[in-house]
Amino acid sequence: MTAQNENAQAQAEQVEVANEAQLEQTAEIQQEQPVEAELAAAYARINELETYVAEADNREKDIQLRAQAEIQNIRRRAEQDVEKAHKFALEKFSKELLTVVDNLERGLNALDTAVTDEKTQALVDGVEMTHKEFISTLAKFGVEAVGVVGEAFNPEVHEAISMQPAEGIEANHISVVLQKGYTLQGRVLRPAMVMVAG
């Protein structure tokens, strides 16, 4: 029986060693599982934070680009406002000068019929030179006359007083200019008052 006891005891020891080894493996696995779970949670949190940082960077870049675009728009608008102010600063002054031009032209028309001698002709020539110089000076500052007989009617720069048939002039073209119109840098100062061929 001793050999059997020894065998039984050896088997019991082997079973006990196997049980201990199995318990150690189970303990190691149980220890590794919480570590792996914590590690997986930590990696998930890291990924989440990296995504948040990337989105924050994108938001910051977007805000910066929008701010730069807004600054450029404000700068461009300010430049346009200054340009318009320079361009049209003379508008009121130019409108007042148009009355002077009209009166000079009326005076010239009246003098043309009243010329009787050389002295009167010299006066007419002087007034004509003054008129031409005045028109030239206005043109230097962007004031241009509009409304010529035979020109196509344009409601943006012409004001039609009436329509009537006219020989040698196409329909919807100016037949008579009652008062010249003027523009300043392309903007209408005063529309031309005209009669249109019908």
From Swiss-Prot:
It is found in: Cytoplasm. GO terms for cellular component: cytosol. Homodimer. It comes from Actinobacillus pleuropneumoniae serotype 5b (strain L20). PROSITE patterns: GRPE (PS01071). Gene3D superfamilies: 3.90.20.20, Head domain of nucleotide exchange factor GrpE. InterPro entries: GrpE, GrpE_coiled_coil, GrpE_head. Pfam families: GrpE (PF01025). GO terms for biological process: protein folding. The keyword ATP-binding does not apply. GO terms for molecular function: adenyl-nucleotide exchange factor activity; protein homodimerization activity; protein-folding chaperone binding; unfolded protein binding. This is Protein GrpE. Transmembrane segments: none annotated. Belongs to the GrpE family. NCBIfam families: PRK14140.1, PRK14150.1. Participates actively in the response to hyperosmotic and heat shock by preventing the aggregation of stress-denatured proteins, in association with DnaK and GrpE. It is the nucleotide exchange factor for DnaK and may function as a thermosensor. Unfolded proteins bind initially to DnaJ; upon interaction with the DnaJ-bound protein, DnaK hydrolyzes its bound ATP, resulting in the formation of a stable complex. GrpE releases ADP from DnaK; ATP binding to DnaK triggers the release of the substrate protein, thus completing the reaction cycle. Keywords: Chaperone, Cytoplasm, Stress response.
